[in-house]
Amino acid sequence: MERTNLTDFNTNTNSIVYLRILTSLTFLIMLCCLILFLARLGTWFAYAQPESISQCTDLWRALWTGFRFDLAILIRLAILGILASIVCIPMPFPLAKIIWVLNYLLGGLIIILVIWLAMANFSYIGFFNRPIDSFAFSGMNYGAETIWPTVTSIEAFELRVGLCIVVTWASFWLCLRVTKKVTRIIKTIKMGKLSFIIFAIFIPLMIISILGRGSVSTFPLSYRHLVVSSDTAINNLVPNGIIALYYGYKEFKASHRIEPATDLEGRNLFEAFYGYPATDDDLFPQFFTRTKQSTFLEENPPHVVLNLVESMANTLLSTDFSGDINLAGELQKHLTEDYYFDRFLPAHDDTQKSLVSLLVNTEYSAISHSRHQTVPLKTSAARVFKNAGYKTIFVYAGFEGLSNRSNYFKAQGFDVFIGAHQLADIYPEMESSVWGGEDQFIFDEVYKHLERHIKGEQPLFIVTLTVTNHPPYNLPLQGTLSIPEKPQQLLARLQDLPEESLDTYLYTNDQLGQFISRIKDSPLKQKTIIAATGDHAIRGMRFNDEERLHEISVPFYLYIPQNYKSSFIPDTHQIASHKDIMPTLYNTALSQVAYPNLGRNLLDPTTKDSVHNFAYHADYLVSNEKSYRKNNEVLLTGKIVKPDFMLTKSPSTEQKELGHGQSYRQVLQWLTRYQLHEHSSLQEQP
């Protein structure tokens, strides 16, 4: 066959440019894969624990699967430029300059995405112990002016940005050097047209199509391939920043879709959850139960104050983690005097999700700023108290517009919603922050409301939500408590967490403790129930695999006046979660009132086979003293929970005992969907 120099036929320029693009993008993909591999190693050594190295097979599987994801996503990003250059080869006029510029820009964009999203994913894992997910998108609802100070408060933020700039510049420089060298080599290549089609087009496209799928089997790489181990630290290595962002966005979009709830689905869930079939009557009311009749409660309804505290981690209240320093402030004595449940889990690792789960019994966190924001839900905690004759008040240290909380919770039965703007009007001395105001003043405001009702004209149900212990961890000027020299065992755990977070943690706990002391030192002591828990644990600390439940745990504190206590002494060491708070408060404060039957009264004895004898967290299910980690909606092999809330190193060899808890999330979703669908149906009626 006649051999033709590519510079000899009329498509010469386009052919040369195609080869330049193919070889340059190949080098670019190899370079980006190396960068992502180094990012994984950095994540492993920065955040994973030495004990995890024993899982060597899983580690290599994670690195290999991650490499496959890297190749697949990089090829998919680069394929447009390659295909465009192939299409231009037979063109009778040169498009070389345009195609080359477009691919040059595409390559630069890929480099920037790879490096900066790798750092974002690295930092996200350090703070949340998981790759970028839907929270990164739902958090945008807070606004850039709120999010940016929070992001910049991450440990060594400037160093991370500087490293990204240096690596980006070095990558651009290296790619330019390689491109110039490749161009010189290509000009010397001689190839016949058939050889060119086979070796320069057909074979590369075949390789690209295989690597772009990430697999030669029937199924290409997908979401399910992100789980390669029962070890969270190992699974965190699999997705690169681009993949994590992609699946996070898909999850975020999916969370906004609320499908209609069918009666058949509800009945199947009812039987799976409660262990017996529903009757033929209307299904929705059967998900409710009633508190016991009590003449005493009817004649003496107590005030109920539920405090939801930002990032109130239980670990920092334990000397096993914090050392010999008191991070509870004045709250410490109340933890000793009253009920303190120390093996307790939040519903989620996110304020908004925990908030709507606890107060509205829904898993749709975006509901407060969705088209369903005005739909009143019967599963709302405020509505249960209103039905019992209570005045309902929400006092929030943050801005009212965050996630549309003011409007939404008023739609869910709160008579009054007081946020940072109103608090600033009432208390001019209050300093503002990116999130709102200072926690001290929500407790002052709650006490004022309770004082006005000291004679008991109408009982109050009050919910508070603090914000001070949130990045960027700005301690209010009124915060006079100081932490003595911090123990090394605690400082060693602060991987991405600034030391200032310990000051704000102490500040809020102390303010809560002072509020409880004021109640106990007043006539309100006899008729005010006080509960407190964390919306989620503190994030960014270092924990090993055996400490995963400690990593997410929050305390549940409960003060009950003597006259309202039962003779039964509750087990404060039982494993419980957010789902059990409201049933406990309902049964302690209310007589003959219907409420969603979704949790247990922690002050009553509980049998092992009880429907509600499990603890629920979005990522964990604890049932029968075994903890099951959820990863991509898959329940992994359980680990035994020790009395100190530590997990065994190895998974349990016993059969899974998931109990009723595995249906809990689906039940919450069905209840919300049913109510929204019912409301829409009523609206459509003439």
Regions found by a protein language model. Name each.
Residues 94-98, 108-109, 127, 204-209, ...:
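A broad, low-specificity signal for short, low-complexity segments enriched in glycine/proline
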Residues 4, 16, 20, 57-58, ...:
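Generic alpha-helical secondary structure signal
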Residues 66, 70, 149-150, 173, ...:
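Residues that form generic nucleotide/phosphate-binding pockets
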Residues 51-58, 128-136, 149-156, 257-269, ...:
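General structural signal for secondary-structure boundaries
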Residues 2-257:
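Transmembrane and membrane-interface helices of multi-pass
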Residues 231, 238, 243, 247-292, ...:
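The feature marks either
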Residues 97-98, 257-267, 371-374, 598-600:
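Short alpha-helical "patches" and their helix-cap loops
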Residues 275-686:
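Solvent-exposed soluble domains appended to multi-pass membrane proteins
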